[in-house]
Amino acid sequence: FKKMDSPTNDGFNSFSASYAAKKSKKKVLLTGVGGDELFSGYPSFNRIPKITKIMNMLPSNINLKNFYLSKFEKFLKNNRLNTKIAGLFKYGKSVDKAFLLQRSLFLPEEIQEILLSNQNQLNINQLNIFNSIEDDVKGFENMRISIIYLEIKYYLCAKLLKDIDWTSMSNSIEMRTPLVDWIFFKKIIPLIKSNIKIGKKDLFNCYSEKLPMEIYKRKKTGFSIPHKKLLNQYTNSNYRFKYSKPIKDWSIFCFKNYLSYEKN
């Protein structure tokens, strides 16, 4: 938390990798960020088309009024259920809003509540999120390209690369991003526009004769962040969980801790 230069809930993994590299006296790390954005590796590429298709098939008179939606959201929250279910009716008809629903942890109404609870006078409407993201996708040929652009702008650039920057620098590690390369982008985009189905496996197969077999055949490994365990560890098991997903509680915890360190 002391080394954060902006609040984030997603930097723990990059920090851990950088810290481990530092301990083992490594100087440079490679990261594959950018691959999921270009090769449609995220769930959003399958979910958003399905969400928008289903929500636009519903009769117009089934749209719930804001009054009932807020009641529904409150019910979901009180019972520690996923409030995004209510958000489907409000944000599920267009690719831009469905993307926000897919990527965000909280609904805009919940964010406003969090800001107010932390004595922040900023109104969520002042951020002009919806108009901005709607303008971003105007003129794109198809939904896949729209999602690629949104993933690159709002997740890769606004979050992942920022997290990689401060977490690696705070551990004196150089983090290289070979897939975030303008020349590589220009080579791939025409294939995407032509609707040729390409995935990360196709990129990997390009190196089948250039990589040692023990690397080429090695199974992918990964790890997840134990949000619940971390919260209990930081608070001596005194944390009162409010949400169905511990990552939501972890995000608020990171936000509040960042503010407290910033004040000091």
Regions found by a protein language model. Name each.
Residues K3-N9, F75-N79, N238-R240:
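A polyampholytic, Gly/Pro-enriched intrinsically disordered region
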Residues F1-D5, F72, Y243-P246, W250:
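Short intrinsically disordered, low-complexity coil segments enriched in acidic
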Residues V28, T83-N264:
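Adenosyl-5′-phosphate
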Residues F1-S18, S44-T52, P190-N195:
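ATP-dependent adenylate-handling ligase core
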Residues N9-G32, L156:
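ATP-dependent adenylation/nucleotidyltransferase module used to activate substrates
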Residues G34-D36:
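Catalytic metal-binding/acid-base residues of hydrolase active sites
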Residues L38-N63:
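A mobile, often basic/glycine-rich helix-loop segment
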Residues L58-L81:
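Alpha-helical "lid/cap" subdomains adjacent to substrate-binding clefts that gate access
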